[in-house]
UniProtKB/Swiss-Prot annotation:
It holds the Pfam family RNase_H. The keyword Cytoplasm applies. It comes from Phenylobacterium zucineum (strain HLK1). This is Ribonuclease H. It is found in: Cytoplasm. Residues 1-142 form the RNase H type-1 domain. Its main location: cytoplasm. It catalyses: Endonucleolytic cleavage to 5'-phosphomonoester.
């Protein structure tokens, strides 16, 4: 099945926790859309999740999606862990609350609107679209860090 939309996502954080950013590139035919944002106090994993969430939520109608991430956390979470978490009421196998469950729940809802083929791509390995997503995440991080330094949230 050929995807209607191809997405590349990335997250970045300066300090973990610290200011962070996320970036996404959405490709539909010949059209591209770039998204980025950031938070003054966050973690790298939260930014990786937010990149995928924002990209999927930006789609106006249900689509066939090929989503590329360099995050093992997102990849393993969506393929291996989420099913057990949901069965256990968002608890880990050790009966502890799932970290970032607010974002995992949001990602779960966003992905269920679409047919998503999740693809892992090696980060910082010269893949053009992954590098562009990384640059967008760093832009979001810079903007969040500047807002934090200026006293904003």
């Amino acid at each position: 099945m050929t995807p209607e939309v191809v997405i590349y996502t990335d997250g970045a954080c300066s300090g973990n926790p610290g200011p962070g950013g996320w970036g996404a590139i959405l490709i539909h035919g010949e059209r591209e859309k770039e998204l980025c944002g950031g938070e003054a106090a966050t973690t790298n994993n939260r930014m990786e999740l937010m990149a995928a969430i924002q990209a999927l939520e930006a789609l106006k109608r249900p689509c066939r999606v090929e989503l590329h991430t360099d995050s093992q956390y997102v990849q393993k979470g969506i393929h291996e862990w989420i099913h057990g978490w949901k069965k256990r009421g968002w608890l880990t196998a050790d009966k502890k609350p799932v970290k970032n469950d607010d974002l995992w729940k949001r990602l779960d809802a966003a992905r269920l609107r679409h047919h998503v083929d999740w693809r892992w791509v090696k980060g910082h390995a010269g893949h053009e679209l992954n590098e562009r997503a990384d640059a967008l995440a760093r832009k979001g991080l810079s903007e969040a860090a500047a807002a934090r330094a200026a006293g904003g949230a």
